[in-house]
Amino acid sequence: MEVKKVVLAYSGGVDTSSCIPYLINEYGVEEVVAFAADLGQGDELEPIREKALSAGASECLVDDLVKPFIEDFAFPAIRANALYEGKYPLSTALARPLISKRLVDIAKELEADAVAHGCTGKGNDQVRFDIAIATLAPELKVLTPARQWGMSREEVIAYGERYGIPAPVSKKSPYSIDLNLLGRSVEAGPLEDISLSPPEEVYQITSSIENTPDQSQEIEIIFEGGNPIAIDGVELDPLSLIVLANQLAGKHGFGRIDMIENRVVGIKSREIYETPGLLLLIKAHQELESLTLPADVLRTKSTLETQWADLVYQGLWFSPLKNALDGFIDRTQDEVNGSVKVKLHKGNATITGRSSSQNSLYLPDFSTYGSQDKFKHDNAEGFIYIWGLPSRLWAQSKNK
C-alpha cells in the first residue's frame, strides 16, 4: 500500500521532530500532517507549529484537549486511586489513549493513508499508541520510524541538527522529558546511573526541601461522587482545581517520585516524576474512601485498583476488562462525598482530618470508649466463638 499522507502524533521533541524529515526522505511520504495535543503543557506549545513546519510538515494541528484529559482521564484515575507499582500516578500514561483517539479521528477526517508516532522500540508509549490505534481503527496503518531507524539518542539529535530542527535537549542536557497538566516525567542522561541522586535541575514544578516554606499549610479538599470539586471551601472548575493543587503541593515539595519501574517490554528503567497535584488528590481521595466505604468494598477495590493501574500503564485503556473495572469503581463512588484536610510541609502531605455528613460510616456512639458507648460488649463473646470455630475445630483434630 502506497502511503502518501500521514498524520503524525507530534510533541515537538527530538524524536517526533526528526520523524518528519525521516518519513519524507526514507518512507517516501508526500505529506506529513503534525498533530499536537494541548494537555496543559503551557509555554512548551507556543513554538510547536513553527517547529513542525520548519521540519517539513505540511501543516500542524494543535487541539485543546485539556477538558477531556481532566474529566475523562485524570478524574477516573483519582477515583481508582491509580498508582502503578504503588508509586506512579500514571500522569503520562493517561494522556496516550486520548492522543491516540484524536489521532485516529484526524486521520479519518483528512482521509490519511496512515498515522505515525515517534516512540522508540524500548519504551512504553509505543505499546500504548499501537494498541489504542489498533483497537479504535484496526484498518489504519501505523508507521513507527523511531522504532526502525536504529539511531541512539545522540545520533537522533545529530540527525535533527542536519535538518535545522531545534530540539529541546542537547548533548549537554540529554534528558527525555514529557510534560502535561498532571506532571512531568524525566529520563535518560545522568539519571541512568541509578546510584546517584537526581540533579536538582530535573525538577521544575516542585520545590526542593531547602526552598520550601518553614511554615506548614493546611488545606481542605472537598469531593463529590469521588471527584474533587473544591479547595478550602472554594468550588473550582476541574482545570483551576488541578492547577491550584499543583501549586500548593509543589510549593511545599510534595509530589517527587524517583523509582525503578518495570516497563511493559520487560526491562527496568529509572523514572523521575513530578506529580504534585495528582498525588495530593489521590491521597485525599483514599482517605475519604476509608471513611465512607465498607471494609469489604475497600478490600475488593484495592485489589482492582492495582489491576486498573496496570491496564492503563500497559496501554489497555480501551480493553473490555478495563471498561468492566470502570463500572465497579464508578459504582463505589456514589458514597464518596465529603472533605479531607491535609497539612503540607517539607515534602510531606499529612492527613489531619476527614468528614462526610452524608456517607460517614464512622459512628461515634459505637466507636467511643466513653459513657455514650452503644456497642453491646457482651455480644462479643458469642461472635468470637463463632468466628474462631474453624480454628478451634482444626486444633481439636490435631490433638486426637
Swiss-Prot record:
GO BP term, example: argininosuccinate metabolic process
One annotated Gene Ontology cellular component of this protein: cytoplasm
Binding site for L-aspartate: T120, N124, D125
Subcellular compartments: Cytoplasm
EC number(s) per entry: 6.3.4.5
Pathway in which the depicted protein is active: Amino-acid biosynthesis; L-arginine biosynthesis; L-arginine from L-ornithine and carbamoyl phosphate: step 2/3
Record field: catalytic activity: L-citrulline + L-aspartate + ATP = 2-(N(omega)-L-arginino)succinate + AMP + diphosphate + H(+)
CDD domains documented for this protein: ASS (cd01999)
Disulfide bond entries: none
Pfam families xref list: Arginosuc_syn_C (PF20979), Arginosuc_synth (PF00764)
HAMAP family hit by this protein: Arg_succ_synth_type1
Family: Belongs to the argininosuccinate synthase family. Type 1 subfamily.
Entry protein name: Argininosuccinate synthase
Organismal lineage: Bacteria, Bacillati, Cyanobacteriota, Cyanophyceae, Synechococcales
